[in-house]
Amino acid sequence: MALAKRIIPCLDVDNGRVVKGVKFENIRDAGDPVEIARRYDEQGADEITFLDITASVDGRDTTLHTVERMASQVFIPLTVGGGVRTVQDIRNLLNAGADKVSINTAAVFNPEFVGEAAARFGSQCIVVAIDAKRVSGPGEAPRWEIFTHGGRKPTGLDAVLWAKKMEDLGAGEILLTSMDQDGMKNGFDLGVTRAISDALGIPVIASGGVGNLEHLAAGVIEGHASAVLAASIFHFGEYTVPEAKAYMASRGIVVR
């Protein structure tokens, strides 16, 4: 029996409001995170991911109050990320009601933090978020590099090797965003999604670039992802979660 593939709406939150931009810029307001999360819960989303996109850049801690409000009204797994730098940050988020915590920039600067977090809280609640950009030129073997700070700072780290290292350190899941595709609505970067999914034994969530329901299906069928994440197609009413599930089922994908 194939494991069901998950559909995960993503809330990018800036100063307490859900926003969506193109390649992390040109931000437009999509509403109150708690109301939006409740709507997705009612629609049958498998999980919700809440990313405080101001936290790492401005050094602000994720709004625990918003997480508490959301967790009190949403009864599906909630992953929270943004500005997570210490074991205490993780403990605070889990205590506020998060089921999983996503570590991004801090993992790059201190990889052992991932191992410490997994040992302390269990791999099942530690997600490592990877922002990858293609750095190979035309005709070269495809290669992707890790970027931090909302895709602004290159690290020199190979994305596939980095993902494997994170798995070895105890990450329970990888949230993979293609910075080339983010907000562009022309589909996931299936090359990096497949390369990382095939290299790892833990689930990989594909993110960045969904513009239609076929893109979600392609993330699973061609990208080999365990879950697919999308934001704007759901926030602005183009598609509902039930429509996405029905479409994926029609493509032969097992959904919950």
Swiss-Prot record:
It is found in: Cytoplasm. Its main location: cytoplasm. InterPro entries: Aldolase_TIM, His_biosynth, HisF, IGPS_HisA/HisF, RibuloseP-bd_barrel. The keyword Amino-acid biosynthesis applies. SUPFAM superfamilies: Ribulose-phoshate binding barrel. Pathway: Amino-acid biosynthesis; L-histidine biosynthesis; L-histidine from 5-phospho-alpha-D-ribose 1-diphosphate: step 5/9. GO terms for biological process: L-histidine biosynthetic process. IGPS catalyzes the conversion of PRFAR and glutamine to IGP, AICAR and glutamate. The HisF subunit catalyzes the cyclization activity that produces IGP and AICAR from PRFAR using the ammonia provided by the HisH subunit. Heterodimer of HisH and HisF. This is Imidazole glycerol phosphate synthase subunit HisF. It comes from Pseudomonas syringae pv. tomato (strain ATCC BAA-871 / DC3000).
